[in-house]
Swiss-Prot record:
GO terms for biological process: RNA processing; RNA repair. Its EC number is 6.5.1.8. Mn(2+) 1 binds at residues 74, 77, 137. Its cofactor is Mn(2+). The gene is rtcB2. Pfam families: RtcB. Keywords: GTP-binding, Ligase, Manganese, Metal-binding, Nucleotide-binding, RNA repair. This is RNA-splicing ligase RtcB2. It comes from Escherichia coli (strain ATCC 25922 / DSM 1103 / LMG 8223 / NCIMB 12210 / NCTC 12241 / WDCM 00013 / Seattle 1946). The keyword Metal-binding applies. Binds 2 manganese ions per subunit. Mn(2+) 2 binds at residues 77, 168, 239. It comes from the Bacteria.
Amino acid sequence: MGKYIRPLSDAVFTIASDDLWIESLAIQQLHTTANLPNMQRVVGMPDLHPGRGYPIGAAFFSVGRFYPALVGNDIGCGMALWQTDILARKYNADKFEKRLSDLDDVAEESWLEENLPSAFAQHPWRNSLGSIGGGNHFVELQQIDQIIDAELFALAGLDAQHLQLLVHSGSRGLGQSILQRHIASFSHHGLPEGSDDALRYIAEHDDALAFARINRQLIALRIMQQVKATGSPVLDVAHNFVSACQIGDQQGWLHRKGATPDDNGLVIIPGSRGDYSWLVKPVANEKTLHSLAHGAGRKWGRTECKGRLAAKYTATQLSRTELGSRVICRDKQLIFEEAPQAYKSAESVVQCLVLAGLIIPVARLRPVLTLKNSGGKKG
């Protein structure tokens, strides 16, 4: 365990192995974050990669002050896994691809009126509910490929004969608006705990957390209705948020930016759209700020993807993967940005967490059909 949880300084740690590549800029950003006032410890996950000033795939613990900029603009972003009643042996790729290709990015008003929970019926951002969003957000039908721990798998309520549905999305424009207002007033200086401004941000942050969770539920509902299926939730875990937390004998604030909690039951670590995802049981560890990787982690920046890939692949070719799955994405730029080649191997990230003693693998899931934003509402 010790050789995989690596101290880079008194306050900076990474979960890493010799076989796992981590970009030097991401390490620099870890050190930069550790130098923020009141910051006590920062931990980079195996999927660590550079962000806009602060790293993604990391957890940060501060005392007396917290930093909304570390959470970023997609407050509440996370993963939700559903068990569907779609029989794997009866899955028809052509039929499902057509049905999901016909689904608009944004839910119709009539659908929202019928399906929105009453608590969100008048929410200012209600029209974004049920929509995936851009970037690395997606919905994916998956099939259990390998059961690694049969007992834990059975306890999870999963069924290997039927397909699973994985939803990765967040608070959409709501989180962005909260961060923009905060940065305009306070820049990157953070907020002293207990202040009126801190309490106001936490209230807005918690609203965005709830909004993101409901959004994932509504996305799953829209998808299942579109393919005439039903399902039940297995897990829903956010990886972008800040919360009050005690680490050792210190009471403070734990920020997670692309970091999955290890104290919230089973979690899923997704791969790229052409890679396996892994259902795992966390092993709680205070040294790593009770956090795990949230995915495979990028190895290429978005702006370089098309230049690296366009000479080898067309957008149509990228809509099929080496694992035999299909990808629906009418945004021709995004399909290059989110190509499997732009990401690390999910297995390398999972293996690093296993060697560090931080997870117990439960099952491996293979992508079947991935849906991403089309780049605008289909009309």
